[in-house]
Amino acid sequence: MAESGTRPDEPERFPRQGNMSSKQDLIQWENTSVETCTILSWLGYGQEIIQARRDAYRELGKLLTAWECCGAYTYFITGSKGEGLSSFFESDQDIMVVNNRVFCLEDDVKSSAFPGEITVLRSLSRRSYHGHCRLLLERRGTTIHRQVNDAFCDDGYGRELLSSDLYVNNWSNEDLTEGIVQHERAGPSIPHTAHGNLHRDKVHALHYYCPNILSKWAARPRHWPPPEAVQRVVSLGAVLTPVGFKGSEYQHVEWRVCFNAGEMELISNLNDTQTKLYVLLKMIKNDVLHPRKKEVSSYTLKNIVLWMAENNPQASFHKKSILQWLHEALDALRVALITLELPYYMIPERNLMATSGLDREQQRTWISTITDMLHEGPRVILRLPKIRQCIVAHPEPLRWYSGRRIELELLWLMRMNRQVICSDENGEVDGTDAIWQALKRRRNEVLTDVGMRMIMEGSRVTNADAMDVRILM
């Protein structure tokens, strides 16, 4: 986005004090909070575009399920894409592929209800860290995929365990379609790049029926989410992803309990202020903390926001209070870094900091940085390049570029799903499709408009494809 007519004095609108010591300070905090919410909407984090992303990626999951699998697998787009909180090229696309021919059951759940073609596995969690388990074969189904069958190993007592390590490796050895470049395995995921610029992390998971875990979560006293949302989360169930607890002697055969679909439901139930609070925290992680190996991840920050939403009245989260809640969230993160403890929202016994890999020097640096940020008060958001750029820009061109960026992203989202619809069994797209052509034509028109305005404002314009990706980063 081009800057035009910058006003370097504008950041002085932001109060310098970290604490609100007077009515005037409170007014400044509230005014700055409202302006921050407006800026975040212009940057692509308004409710409408977030919902459009969620709808598009939910539809993509359904299309991939119908197109590729014939009922054998269910596809979900998870992570920030599924949550609607990152633009098209801003982060990797996380894809979860769940095997519909395998069901894993909690210790005391009966298996007789499942038809004969289903392979049934029993979870053994007593010797595993909270939120992890091993999987013992209870019944081999009449229809069993090679990647599952070849992942069984002996537990030393003549019983068959499903190895998480072997399961990922079996999927890593699959043949790739044209245009796909696979990268080195990253924990449970198999990263790859499609067509040079679409980065995806694919995780192959298994259904997990765990009514005891979910009923315990649902029974907690809470301000949020509402009862109907709690029941939807319970109905969405859980999955097991192929990754063990770091350092466990059973790590290669352990699986981690995850609630991806339920957590996306929870995120969709956050109000506008809570959602933007999560976005601000992710910006701070990326632009200020710069974690090297996910010692602090977006998942860490998401759990802080979910706990805050559950433990406080929903009405207290509004546009005028977002920076006060950012202060609270940063303090919660600082405490987690000091104590190396943060309970997992769905299974509080699991400590998300237990395997953070945080070394002492980095721990001290981050604690010091966050402490400084807490003393800065509302001015902390000036550390964020995207926010600062918007503050010093004139509103009119900012709104104009924001509108074009949002339209361009909507076109990409529609094109993404149309590509699946118009592709044959080899993945070749029918370029004569009228809707495909219309989307391409409108994309070119928007890019031409943006390029012309940038030239008029004295900016250097690269080729259209490079500009397209840069706008949606």
Regions found by a protein language model. Give the residues of each.
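Non-catalytic helical "accessory" subdomain of NTase-fold nucleotidyltransferases
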Residues: 1-473
